[in-house]
């Protein structure tokens, strides 16, 4: 009798369901997080441990192999341009849906559980004191090793790109250095596969803690907001990304099926970082050049948070409607412009979505205290927007590869179809 092997997606789904069941049974029990939180934190720490080495080694291999700085500069300009266009679409879609469905009308926000947001207020104050020039100046590190310790991804990318260009410029003398980082890259992707073996346990622990703390009751008073956010994110995922994928020559449904393991893991953990290494590996498998993948995806984690900005635009109008504040078209245009800036400038800040909302609400006259009432359901919405964020960045690698004339859609479709067949065969044993 053949041994039945379950794929990673199935294992994670089982962990997710068991976590929900345990969280519901022990809802409000302070002892549960004491036992489960360390397990979830351990899994997240294992992932964060390998993200920076993978980004650095992959970026060096990709950029040094790409050649001159002119090519890298062109790719950088096109990437940022694409990110700005797609995130602007997300903001406008969020505002349009909030205006049509009015999720905040008739909601008594005081029925919702109030949460502590003081940490986000302090972070917002720190960030608001920085000028736009200071924000962009921060991209260039004064000490690369300090940036590594702090996990400052933009500063790390800046140094790594320059270092890779230096390796490329010295020709033969740079080959041993390049070979070293190729070895690092291969080794780290092997470590990723090892870490993924404990992913179902991490998901079980994280979901169990979340449900035990917030329960399902908080969904009732803020159900309209949560429902609209999920509908909006699903629309963006299928329709907007579907159009982008079609232009790139692939099917969005095959693309999503190809990434189902990563999508389920990101949804369960509310963390894009947990799947960054696997997303990079999978985009290379469907034909995206390593240089483009290692450049576009890490930068996208800072500049291309489509799910987050879509949520932020809906949440801002939701709070305005709750407080009975009528926002004119000019207020909403201001909101679009402010979100376009703040969502980029604060992308590496902990609790980004809340910090961005705090920075934005004041510009349109909406009381920031309202965020304390929606904080209780933020984790539930964060799960969905994380999926859109990671899908957007994976798709961006495909778009940039296509734009550079280095992507074969037919080959990609074949690889994605083969992958689905192999996964099904694994599950059926």
From Swiss-Prot:
Q: Name one GO biological process term.
A: dicarboxylic acid transport
State the Gene Ontology terms under molecular function. Answer: symporter activity; transmembrane transporter activity
Q: What is its main location?
A: membrane
The domain of life is Bacteria
* Keyword vocabulary terms for this entry: Amino-acid transport, Cell membrane, Membrane, Symport, Transmembrane, Transmembrane helix, Transport
| Location in the cell | Cell membrane; Membrane raft
Which Gene3D superfamilies does UniProt cross-reference here?
Sodium:dicarboxylate symporter (1.10.3860.10)
Output the PROSITE patterns linked to this UniProt entry.
NA_DICARBOXYL_SYMP_1 (PS00713), NA_DICARBOXYL_SYMP_2 (PS00714)
Q: How does it assemble?
A: Homotrimer. Interacts with FloT.
What is the annotated role of this protein in its UniProt record? This carrier protein is part of the Na(+)-dependent, binding-protein-independent glutamate-aspartate transport system.
Please give the family membership noted in the entry.
Answer: Belongs to the dicarboxylate/amino acid:cation symporter (DAACS) (TC 2.A.23) family.
What this protein is called in its record is Proton/sodium-glutamate symport protein
Q: Mind giving the lineage of the organism this protein is from?
A: Bacteria, Bacillati, Bacillota, Bacilli, Bacillales
